[in-house]
C-alpha cells in the first residue's frame, strides 16, 4: 500500500503466514510475559496481535517503555498462533506478527482516558479529550453508523428524484421560535446575520423557483438548552420540500424511507403501518404529543363518571371546568401502600395536587380512597372504559385539561417503566396530525401561532374568517418513534391572502409581514405552487438506531449541556481590536 502499511489491522489471515508485512497503528494493549511482550496493534479497521521477544534488546526495550496509544509502524513476519491461543473474537485471531523492526511515529503522554477500558468517565473529561473518546469502539461505531445512515439517506432521496441543494448559512433572523445565533457584520455597521434555525424560507423559495423535489442534510443552529434528545447549538436534519403535494404525499415519501433506514441499520422490529393520531387524541389517550406506542397503557377521560358523584373533590373540580383522567395500572391491586404513595408523591413533584386511585381486588370488591364514594354503576363504567380486570388498579388526576394531560402522561410513562410494560427491541412509529393552528397566550393575553406560522390552515380563508381561531386546525404533522419526535412538517400556506389573514389574527399587520418575510411575500406574488415538507432529525434517527440515551453520543464533537465546547474552548472572549472592528461593546451583567 505505502511505506506505512502493506495491510490493515483487520486483514491478515492464515493465507498470509510467512509473509513479511508492514503495519501501522496505535498500541492498544500490552501483555508482558517476561521474555515476550504481546501488543494489540489497532487501526481504524481492526486489531492485530504483535509479538516482541528479547532476542533484539533494542526493540524489546522500546516496546517495554512505550505507553499505550503511542503510534508505531512495524515490520514483521506473519505466523500462525498456537491452537490454544486462537482468538475467535478477532478477524485476525488465528495469526500473529513476529516484529523485526519498529518505528515510533509519536509517543503518547499519560492517558486521561483508558481506551481499552469499559470504564465510564465524566462527560467533561470525555468532551475535553474527545479525540481520545472517539478511539473507543462504542463511540467510534456511533459515528460510523451516522455516516452510513446519511449515505443511505442520500441514495434513497436521489432514487426518489430529489435534488440536493445547499442553502445559505449566513441569513436573517427566522421565525422558528427559538433564539438565533447572531453574527455581527463588519461591513454593515450595526447589522447582524443569523445562523439558520432551519432552511424554512429558502426551501419554500426553491419551490417558487420551480424546483419540484429538494433535499439537503442541513445544519441548523438554535440557541436552546440541552436535553437528552436535543443538542444545544448545532444539529442536522434531512430537510425536504416538494411541490404540488398533499399531506399524504409527504407521508408516502417518509414512511418507506424510515422503514428502509431502521430496517437496514437495526435488528429491532419496526411497524410497517404508521398509525395517524390527532393531536387531540394524542394528548387525551397518551398525555403527550410524542406518544410512545411501546407502552400499552391508554389514558381515558372519566369526567362524566365523576360528575354529580359523591366524591366532592372531583365533582367540585368538574363544576369549575376541570376534567378527570384515568390511568390504568394492571396487576397492581395487591401492591403495598408504598407503591401508591410513591405515585402520589411523583405527581406532586410535577405540580399536581395529588392522585386518586382505586384497586379492583376482584370482580366484586373495589378499594382505595375513592372507591367508597362511587356506586356500583360508576365503578363498573370505570372498569369498562379503562379495560380493567380483577387485580388491576386505576389512578386518577383532576385538573384543567392541559395540565391533566401532562400529569396523566407522565404517570403513564412512569407506570410503563416500573411495571415493565414497555415493549423492547422494537420501533413504534406514528404520525401526530391535526395540530391546532393557533393557541392562546395567557401571559400576553393574545392569540399566537401554535407551531409553524407558514402552514396552511384546514378550511383555508373561510375558516380564518368564520371560525373561532382556537378551533382551527393546521395541515401540520409530526412523525414520532418510541416517544421521540423525529420531525415536524407541514403543508405550506402558498396564498398571500390567507397568509395575511392568519398573521392578522396573531397580531401582525400586512406591513409587518411584508417587512419581516419580504422575500417570501415578494416571491408569492409571482406564482407559488402548493408545496409542503418535513425535516427528520439526523441526530435523533442515529440516536435511536445506536440505542443510546443521549444525543451527544452520536455527534462527533458536541457541546456539553451548558453549550460549551470543552475541546476547543468555545465560546471564548475576543480581543478589543476585534470588538472595535465589529463596532461591538461588551456590557457586563450586573
From Swiss-Prot:
Gene: aspS
Enzyme category, top tier: ligase
Biological role: Aspartyl-tRNA synthetase with relaxed tRNA specificity since it is able to aspartylate not only its cognate tRNA(Asp) but also tRNA(Asn). Reaction proceeds in two steps: L-aspartate is first activated by ATP to form Asp-AMP and then transferred to the acceptor end of tRNA(Asp/Asn).
Binding annotation for ATP: 222-224, 485, 537-540
GO cellular component annotations of the record: cytoplasm
Organism this protein belongs to: Ehrlichia ruminantium (strain Gardel)
Residues the UniProt record annotates as site (Important for tRNA non-discrimination): 33
Record EC number: 6.1.1.23
Gene3D superfamilies found in the cross-reference section: Bira Bifunctional Protein, Domain 2, GAD-like domain, Nucleic acid-binding proteins
Family assignment from sequence similarity: Belongs to the class-II aminoacyl-tRNA synthetase family. Type 1 subfamily.
HAMAP family reported in the protein's UniProt record: Asp_tRNA_synth_type1
Name of the protein in its database record: Aspartate--tRNA(Asp/Asn) ligase
Superkingdom of this protein's organism: Bacteria
Subunit-level organization: Homodimer.
Substrates-to-products reaction catalysed: tRNA(Asx) + L-aspartate + ATP = L-aspartyl-tRNA(Asx) + AMP + diphosphate
GO biological process: aspartyl-tRNA aminoacylation
Residues noted as binding L-aspartate in the record, renumbered to the chain: 176, 222, 451, 492
Disulfide bond residue pairs: none
